[in-house]
Design a protein with these regions (language model features):
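Short hydrophobic transmembrane-like helices used for membrane targeting/insertion
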Residues: 1-2, 28
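Bacterial N-terminal signal peptides
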Residues: 9-23
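Catalytic-site microenvironment of enzymes
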Residues: 28, 84, 132-136
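C-terminal accessory segments enriched in acidic
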Residues: 28-58, 194, 219-434
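Soluble metallo-hydrolase cores and metallopeptidase-like ectodomains found primarily
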Residues: 54-103
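Conserved beta-strand scaffold positions in the cores of enzyme catalytic domains, especially
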Residues: 81, 95, 150, 199, ...
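Active-site/substrate-binding loop(s) of hydrolase catalytic cores
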Residues: 102-111, 115-259, 275
């Protein structure tokens, strides 16, 4: 909370917010860019909204947390919240507007109900906007130059169950063409009423790698195509430069863990259509980082990415920004298997053992929960996020009707020997060992 953390942040932070014109906004050289990036991360830490420590939360819990944070700050002068429609099940879908500038910007998050990382980040940005000191130059200059509208939770029914689809079972991000769902119509109506120059399509993805042999992707970026030819018109070109600005900032924090999302044209998707409708749109996909199962570090990095992007729009530096940091990113590669156990022997119910590799796919690859069997057999050439050599060890599965079934729930113990009482090396899922 600000009350305890803000005063103790010291002269360094205070100096960042009291810098003269053009220091936080403007093209000011590498040293000041680094200083500005540090300031954005300080904002992410100092204004983190309590009550959102886990990435699964409901519509009511989210708005209660946001309301508490904004209420403490008496945000009514700086922040406007309005209902823009209701979901299939009647939950309120709200838009938040900040700033009063001539350039309209639209951000929307959690159109997939189980993709909540940026939803948390938007709460933190709103908290900063409402509670930062009156002489906070960054906020004041953003407010003068941009009008920012956020829809933090577009699919509250999906969020209620923490599932991708809405209450009709529809992927809202595949309804931009038909507009059959209320959630899709709401987003389209807001876009049409604002006619935003820039859009941010905020999502989460599974466990992908940066290139075929790269690191786990923390964040993937995309300037979506507006047509089958994937042409680079002026609207998409601006999104490309904006993606480059974000990529350069993130590379400083998680080098090697940024990737470029596939830009094949998807005629039903909102990002592609936003581009086609004239809004320069960037897709930000929050992936996974080691030791970050609740995506709290990615929450922090989304604050950095969004504030970096907004600042580049506001100060005009975007117009001359290089696309190279985006163009040079490795491709975002989907990995079929989360884990492969290689080189061991699988012990069946009759005690016989067989030289079989075992692939495992998690229902939640980030938290590594819900393990299920993938392919079984010779997987020497299979790609996985993690491959564990279990040569000389024995895999003892709990069998489903005497069989190992692809897609079946994994309950497996790795032991030193074929004897079911031999020493335990590992259990999947992990439990207290014998």
């Amino acid at each position: 909370m600000i009350g305890s953390g803000w005063p103790g942040s010291g002269s360094f932070l205070l100096s960042l917010f009291l810098l003269g014109p053009g220091r936080l906004l403007g093209q000011v050289g590498p040293a000041a860019e680094s200083e500005r990036q540090d300031a954005f991360l300080v904002i992410a830490d100092a204004y983190r909204v309590p009550g959102l420590e886990h990435r699964r939360f409901t519509h009511d819990a989210y708005w209660a947390a946001v309301g508490s944070a904004l209420g403490e700050a008496d945000a009514s002068v700086r922040v406007s919240i309005a209902e823009v429609g209701r979901s299939v099940e009647g939950r309120s879908i709200r838009a938040v507007t900040i700033g009063r500038g001539p350039v309209p910007v639209l951000l929307w998050s959690q159109m997939h109900g189980d993709e909540s990382t940026a939803t948390m980040s938007l709460a933190d940005i709103l908290h900063w906007w409402a509670a930062s000191p009156e002489d906070d130059r960054l906020r004041r200059e953003l407010a003068d130059r941009l009008t920012i509208t956020m829809i933090p939770m577009l699919n509250p029914d999906g969020a209620e169950r923490f599932v991708r689809h809405n209450a009709l079972g529809v992927d809202v991000n595949r309804d931009a063409r038909r507009l059959a769902t209320p959630e899709a119509r709401i987003l389209k109506d807001v876009r049409d009423s604002l006619d935003p120059d820039f859009g941010f399509n905020l999502h989460d993805q599974g466990s992908n790698t940066a290139g075929s042999d790269g690191e786990l992707v923390g964040i993937a970026l995309l300037a979506p195509a507006a047509d089958e030819e994937r042409s680079w018109g002026p609207v998409r070109q601006r999104a490309r430069r904006l993606s480059g600005v974000i990529a350069a900032a993130l590379e400083e924090e998680i080098p090697g863990r940024i990737a470029r999302y596939d830009d094949s044209f998807t005629p039903r998707a909102f990002g592609d259509n936003m581009q086609r409708w004239g809004t320069s749109t960037v897709l930000i996909e929050s992936g996974a980082l080691p030791e970050d199962p609740e995506k709290q570090e990615l929450r922090r990095l989304n604050v950095l990415a969004i504030l970096t992007a907004l600042t580049s729009i506001a100060d005009g530096s975007l117009e001359s920004a290089s696309t190279a940091p985006y163009d040079d990113l490795p491709m975002n590669v989907d990995v079929t298997n989360d884990l492969v156990l290689s080189g061991g022997r699988v012990v069946m119910g009759d005690g016989a053992s067989y030289p079989l590799d075992v692939a495992i796919v998690y229902d939640d690859a980030v938290a590594r929960t819900g393990p299920r069997y993938g392919e079984i057999g010779d997987l020497a050439d299979a790609r996985a996020l993690e491959t564990v050599d279990v040569s000389g060890l024995y895999l003892h599965p709990e069998l489903d009707g005497g069989l190992l079934r692809r897609g079946g729930e994994v309950r497996l113990t790795v032991r030193r020997g074929a004897d079911p009482e031999s020493e335990v090396v590992r259990r999947i899922p992990a439990v207290v060992e014998d």
